[in-house]
C-alpha cells in the first residue's frame, strides 16, 4: 500500500460524505414537491 501520510484521501472523504448529503437534499426536495416538506 502507498503511504498517504496517514490521512484519508480527500476524494474518498468527499464521496462518503457527499452521497448522503445529496440523498438528503433529494429527499427534502421530493418531500416539498409532495407537500411533506412543510413539516420539516
Swiss-Prot record:
Pfam families: PsbJ. Keywords: Chloroplast, Membrane, Photosynthesis, Photosystem II, Plastid, Reaction center, Thylakoid, Transmembrane, Transmembrane helix. The keyword Chloroplast applies. It is found in: Plastid, Chloroplast thylakoid membrane. SUPFAM superfamilies: Photosystem II reaction center protein J, PsbJ. InterPro entries: PSII_PsbJ (IPR002682), PSII_PsbJ_sf (IPR037267). It is a single-pass membrane protein. One of its GO terms (biological process) is photosynthesis. It comes from the Eukaryota. The keyword Thylakoid applies. PSII is composed of 1 copy each of membrane proteins PsbA, PsbB, PsbC, PsbD, PsbE, PsbF, PsbH, PsbI, PsbJ, PsbK, PsbL, PsbM, PsbT, PsbX, PsbY, PsbZ, Psb30/Ycf12, at least 3 peripheral proteins of the oxygen-evolving complex and a large number of cofactors. It forms dimeric complexes. One of the components of the core complex of photosystem II (PSII). PSII is a light-driven water:plastoquinone oxidoreductase that uses light energy to abstract electrons from H(2)O, generating O(2) and a proton gradient subsequently used for ATP formation. It consists of a core antenna complex that captures photons, and an electron transfer chain that converts photonic excitation into a charge separation. Belongs to the PsbJ family. HAMAP family: PSII_PsbJ (MF_01305). NCBIfam families: PRK02565.1 (NF002722). This is Photosystem II reaction center protein J. The gene is psbJ.
Amino acid at each position: 500500500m502507498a503511504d498517504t501520510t496517514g490521512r484519508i484521501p480527500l476524494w474518498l472523504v468527499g464521496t462518503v460524505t457527499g452521497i448522503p448529503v445529496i440523498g438528503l437534499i433529494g429527499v427534502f426536495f421530493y418531500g416539498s414537491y409532495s407537500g411533506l416538506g412543510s413539516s420539516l
